[in-house]
């Protein structure tokens, strides 16, 4: 038998395997992302019950099986975030957050800040309504934890301050472009308003944001493009998130 481990982890994904079992993707503070085989999870609710649902925080007992797959021997809910599960907007945000986490990090790479940030964001959703700027903050925190933080205070190309003139955001370059560099920016570069740039900088500093719906939509598009460039695809949960967008407070 391989090594064993007891971890605090968030369920990122749970996939049925055959008629009896499940394979779950977990994200732990100590070991990062890992996959675990839950034998009998479908056929016996006594063993795992509703423990393996996505965005559940659980205590997991695992055993190495060889390769990249662990065996899930036992699991207990630490926090089920039950309040958020009755609201479509909060479900959409939580689903997006766990999928973004799953896609941004590699297996077996600890990201303590991202784990703490994900748990904090799920707790925020559990305790109150889904708010667009809270999700923008999580996106920025997730990008930073993965080493992909966009440059917002200096030009991503030349490094100089963007200045007071019109600025553009180029997701391929990895951030904001000053007026001079923006005039020759790539095809993916888009204008970024001073209000949105200031709001995103405030979020990066951990400060609060007061902005209107127009700025919120612009920030969502900018960070969404940045994430898609880094991942090379559009997240499946993004469509659901866009559909419930008008429901967000």
Which role does the model predict for each range below?
Residues 1-249:
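Non-catalytic alpha-helical scaffolds and adjoining flexible linkers that form interface surfaces
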């Amino acid at each position: 038998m391989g090594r064993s481990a007891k971890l605090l982890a968030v369920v990122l994904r749970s996939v049925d395997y055959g008629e009896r079992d499940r394979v779950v993707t977990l994200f732990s503070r100590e070991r990062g992302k890992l996959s675990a085989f839950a034998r009998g999870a479908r056929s016996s609710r006594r063993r795992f019950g509703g423990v393996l649902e996505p965005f559940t925080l659980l205590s997991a007992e695992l055993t190495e099986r060889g390769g990249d797959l662990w065996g899930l021997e036992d699991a207990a809910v630490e926090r089920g975030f039950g309040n958020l599960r009755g609201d479509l907007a909060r479900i959409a945000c939580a689903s997006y957050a766990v999928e973004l986490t799953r896609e941004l990090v590699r297996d077996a790479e600890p990201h303590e800040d991202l784990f703490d940030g994900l748990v904090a964001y799920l707790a925020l959703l559990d305790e109150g309504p889904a708010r667009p700027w809270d999700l923008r903050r999580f996106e920025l925190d997730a990008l930073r934890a993965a080493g992909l933080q966009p440059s917002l205070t200096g030009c991503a190309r030349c490094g100089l301050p963007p200045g007071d003139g019109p600025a553009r955001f180029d997701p391929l370059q990895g951030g904001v472009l000053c007026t001079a560099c923006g005039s020759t920016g790539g095809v993916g570069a888009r204008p970024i308003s001073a209000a949105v740039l200031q709001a995103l900088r405030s979020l990066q500093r951990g400060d609060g944001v007061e902005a209107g719906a127009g700025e919120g939509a612009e920030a969502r598009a900018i960070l969404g493009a940045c994430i898609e460039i880094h991942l090379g695809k559009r997240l499946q949960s993004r469509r659901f998130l866009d559909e419930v967008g008008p429901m967000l407070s």
